[in-house]
């Protein structure tokens, strides 16, 4: 064996030192078993790591050089994605105009501290499904418990956060892009039992029994009809869909929404500069020019021109009753608008006659799905956000709010019996939370599937913090017609 040079010893020492610093950071001393292999790569060279370089067959050398490069790249990407940063593309308009559809984000894992993966055996760059093959991109065994490596800080109020979708633990594959499993199950159950029940006249226990009936019926409907709903899958925390929203409530806060304004502990919080709501906009007769909509920043997907006569009754109820000489209603658009966009349109008296905010009946069912309330997306709560170590008294009124935290996120067994609440077989009326939770909402308040619909975000679901937009593409434009939004390149996220 050829004696190692001084340079090789120095390289080996630096590599081992950096690796030990990494192990100290992630607090995983199992990784020490790798140290002898690092030593062998630089010094002893007992293992023929580059055996293919000595092959006399040029094809073998060529193929193996590519394999070597690809494996190295995949391993590097794997560790960078887990511990440093990952790329994320904005898929929906829920955070417009703060973040736009087509924005590509640099998401820092260091901001809140990276998580050790729940499913360590997975393919890099694939969240849960391998493209083309349409199979799982991860192996379910082994599964590691939640552990977060120290980072630069914690989630703060008004931070934009990337996280795993909490209600994405169970998915009906054919509906995974539109409706979470639980909302789908309750909706199908209510459709099956179509006779309306006056919940106001029932006790909380009776209401719970009705909600359980809806959910069980809907769940059976989904499981028994895979052709319609697709296969039903369970996903570990780190393999659930990535969502991005703004944190508007921290652990221990009491949150309430009053007329669209978020209140924390009774005080209004600062609204994002580009807060949006949906409106019905009626013109004085002509259509709104496409150039004007483009200049306002309203995408084609968010622009709906209402021409179906079936809408007329609803439009008249909203006071959108301006008609032309032939007696036909003037054109009405359904648009998401910021205050600035609202003022711009309303100020154009020659074109715009009326603007009315979208009524509440256009919203879906609020969280918790199994609690009868009169909450809606603009008037919600109050609701207390769980904090690690905090103890609450459980009642019939608040159990549906915190039941999912207790069972799905913190792994307990909960039963409601005639004589009370049982957790892990023991009767109790208290529970102490093991994790912190957050309340996430989109800036596009009427076009955002957020905590108002599916509840709290547990700390173990937090992925990272978007730092910068490194690329932004407008899907409504061509490459030679402004597809690249140059003014958004390398724009800081706030």
Task: Give the positions of each predicted feature.
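Extended hydrophobic leader/signal-anchor segments used for secretion and membrane insertion
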Residues: 1-494
């Amino acid at each position: 064996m050829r004696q190692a040079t001084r340079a090789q010893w120095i390289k080996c020492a630096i590599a081992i030192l950096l690796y030990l610093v990494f192990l100290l950071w992630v607090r995983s001393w199992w990784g020490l078993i790798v140290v002898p292999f690092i030593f062998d790569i630089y010094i002893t060279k007992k293992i023929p790591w580059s055996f293919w370089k000595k092959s006399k067959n040029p094809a073998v050398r060529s193929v193996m050089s590519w394999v070597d490069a690809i494996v190295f790249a995949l391993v590097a990407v794997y560790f960078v994605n887990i511990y440093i940063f990952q790329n994320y593309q904005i898929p929906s308009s829920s955070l417009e105009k703060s973040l736009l559809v087509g924005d590509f984000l640099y998401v820092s894992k260091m901001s809140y501290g990276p998580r050790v993966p729940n499913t360590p055996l997975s393919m890099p760059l694939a969240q849960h499904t391998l493209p083309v093959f349409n199979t799982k991109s991860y192996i379910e065994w082994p599964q590691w418990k939640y552990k977060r490596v120290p980072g630069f800080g914690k989630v703060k109020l008004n931070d934009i956060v990337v996280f795993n979708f909490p209600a994405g633990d169970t998915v009906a594959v054919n509906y995974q892009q539109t409706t979470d499993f639980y909302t789908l199950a309750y909706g199908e159950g209510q459709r099956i039992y179509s006779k309306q029940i006056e919940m106001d006249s029932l006790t909380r226990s009776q209401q719970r029994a009705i909600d359980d009936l809806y959910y069980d019926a809907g769940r059976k409907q989904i499981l028994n009809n895979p052709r319609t709903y697709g296969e039903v899958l369970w996903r570990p925390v780190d393999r659930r869909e990535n969502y991005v929203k703004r944190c508007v409530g921290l652990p221990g806060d009491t949150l309430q929404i009053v007329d669209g304004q978020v209140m924390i502990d009774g005080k209004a919080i600062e609204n994002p500069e580009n807060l949006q709501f949906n409106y019905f906009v009626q013109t004085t007769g002509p259509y709104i020019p496409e150039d004007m909509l483009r200049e306002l920043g309203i995408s084609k997907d968010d622009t709906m021109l209402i021409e179906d006569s079936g809408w007329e009754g609803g439009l008249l109820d909203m006071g959108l009753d301006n008609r032309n000489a032939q007696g036909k209603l003037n054109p009405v658009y359904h648009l998401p608008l910021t205050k600035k966009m609202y003022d711009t349109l309303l100020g154009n008296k020659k074109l715009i006659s009326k603007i009315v905010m979208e009524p509440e009946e256009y919203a879906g069912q609020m969280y918790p799905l199994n609690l009868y309330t009169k909450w809606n997306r603009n008037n919600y709560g109050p609701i207390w956000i769980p904090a690690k170590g905090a103890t609450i008294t459980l009642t019939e009124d608040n159990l549906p709010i915190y039941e999912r935290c207790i069972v799905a996120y913190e792994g307990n067994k909960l039963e409601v019996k005639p004589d009370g609440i049982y957790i892990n077989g023991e009767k109790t009326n208290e529970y102490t939370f093991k994790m912190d939770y957050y309340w996430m909402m989109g800036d596009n308040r009427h076009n955002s599937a957020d905590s108002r619909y599916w509840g709290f975000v547990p700390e173990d679901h937090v992925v990272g913090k978007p730092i910068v937009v490194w690329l932004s593409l407008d899907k409504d434009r061509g490459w030679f017609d402004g597809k690249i939004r140059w003014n958004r390149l390398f724009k800081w996220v706030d």
